[in-house]
């Protein structure tokens, strides 16, 4: 059996397996255990009581986190006409149509969010096989197909979290950085939970919020007592 490193031994003294922590205690321990030399991301996993095989329970959407995610977000926008200046003024990293399509086809896919105005979808549609598997295909459900490209870019840059339930009905997302204070992280988590409450499918039966866990990029995970969050 491999020996534990000094860091692993330190972390193992802080984690009690099979224990559920209050959200504040869990976040405090995450910060203590975050010993990487970079500002680690704080990720959340929320197990929902849904059946994603049913179309109306295949949850996806977006929410603005009040304290942002701490990530630098690169945004590409497909649009034309007056919207070009609007997207640029809002902070888009690149704006285009056919030229942007060709750039992406050539391998330039270094973007976190791709936004499109409705009149650009004819061009964007040709990139389905490139953007789809990467989760970058614009979609009106998450606000990335819109006539208001300025607002969409601003939202993406200011800390918009796009979420989608995976095959097991689990929502994953980044809710901040280790450098954030505990109250800011807790507020972001509660806002995400509030959003998921709003989009609860009417056909979902039984317990909706089943489990909540949080972890940092290089650290351990902690199970959170659901009574300590706004469910």
Curated annotation (Swiss-Prot):
CDD domains: Ribosomal_L1. The gene is rplA. PANTHER family: 54S RIBOSOMAL PROTEIN L1, MITOCHONDRIAL, LARGE RIBOSOMAL SUBUNIT PROTEIN UL1M. Part of the 50S ribosomal subunit. This is Large ribosomal subunit protein uL1. One of its GO terms (cellular component) is cytosolic large ribosomal subunit. Binds directly to 23S rRNA. The L1 stalk is quite mobile in the ribosome, and is involved in E site tRNA release. Gene3D superfamilies: 3.30.190.20, 3.40.50.790. Belongs to the universal ribosomal protein uL1 family. Keywords: Repressor, Ribonucleoprotein, Ribosomal protein, RNA-binding, rRNA-binding, Translation regulation, tRNA-binding. One of its GO terms (biological process) is regulation of translation. The lineage of its organism: Bacteria, Pseudomonadati, Pseudomonadota, Gammaproteobacteria, Candidatus Pseudothioglobaceae. It comes from the Bacteria. It holds the Pfam family Ribosomal_L1. One of its GO terms (molecular function) is rRNA binding.
């Amino acid at each position: 059996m491999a020996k534990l490193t000094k860091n692993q031994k330190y972390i193992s003294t802080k984690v009690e397996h099979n224990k559920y922590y209050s959200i504040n205690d869990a976040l405090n321990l995450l910060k203590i255990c975050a010993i990487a030399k970079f500002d680690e991301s704080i990720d959340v996993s929320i197990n929902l009581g849904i059946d994603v095989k049913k179309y109306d329970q295949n949850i996806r959407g977006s929410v603005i986190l009040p304290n942002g995610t701490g990530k630098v977000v690169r945004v590409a926008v497909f649009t034309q006409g007056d919207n070009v200046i609007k997207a640029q003024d809002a902070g888009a990293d690149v704006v285009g149509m056919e030229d942007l399509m060709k750039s992406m086809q050539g391998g330039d896919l270094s973007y976190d969010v791709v936004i499109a105005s409705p009149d650009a979808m004819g061009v964007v549609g040709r990139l389905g096989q490139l953007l789809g598997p990467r989760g970058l295909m614009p979609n009106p459900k998450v606000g990335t197909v819109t006539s208001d490209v300025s607002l969409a870019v601003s939202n993406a840059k200011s800390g918009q979290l796009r979420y989608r339930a995976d095959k097991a009905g689990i929502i994953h997302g980044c809710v901040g950085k280790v450098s954030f204070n505990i109250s800011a992280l807790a507020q972001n988590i509660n806002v995400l939970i509030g959003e998921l409450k709003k989009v609860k499918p009417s056909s979902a039966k039984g317990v909706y919020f089943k489990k909540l866990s949080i972890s940092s990029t290089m650290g351990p995970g902690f199970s959170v007592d659901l009574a300590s969050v706004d469910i």
